[in-house]
Amino acid sequence: MEIKKFEIGQKTLRTDTQIVVISFFRFKGIFQKIWAFGQMGFARKKLKNIKEISFYKLFGSGTGEGFTPYPNTSVYAILSVWNDINIAEKSIREKEIYEKYRAKSVENWNVFLSPISSKGYWDKINPFDPLKKEAVSEEKMLAALTRATIKPKIMLKFWSRVPAISKVIGNDKNVLFKMGLGEIPWFHQVTFSIWPNAEAMSNFARKEGPHAKAIKSVREGNWFSEELYARFKVEKAIGKWCGKSVI
């Protein structure tokens, strides 16, 4: 089997079994929230020094389920890309930076994902290496991630559309989990959702309404300076969110 490699900085990792992990953390108390906010800068070096990680991102979130321009000082997340699910799980359990996040937070949830498809760029690269199509069942639980750098002149127009889209997602009984995240408030945005199968995900994407209209406006108005759309097979999850097992 041909082994593909992905390079970032000085790191070169096998990605034949690439795993993407999104770790969510909820904080309570002013000092814990201040610590979490500070880690948006300070945790970068710690994550960069973990040689098994080929790509990472730190996120804040919006109020509610994250799909608002108003920051939620309680919820933060880390996205990390690994070359093996066992290495990822062991590292997240044992590495100091993850231990500190767990110690400071009141709850945390980690979802392990295998890329199925990925189109576009994130900081001028595509960090996700998809599985072969035959390795994915249409009936398996899937996740969708979209990220975009919003052009400054479009920011107000973009955020005026978000409440209607958020309401549609929230009312969809098929969505198992959804969260809006941000690298840089208002400008670098990420949406993440989990669906029971490919059909449910596709039905939402094709449905007429605010979501479809927003996509049309994005394409016609060239709203984003950079964007990426990815789908994943959900492999497993560890921890709880809102006091319960999500999937």
Label for each model-derived stretch:
Residues 224:
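An exposed tryptophan-centered "aromatic clamp" motif
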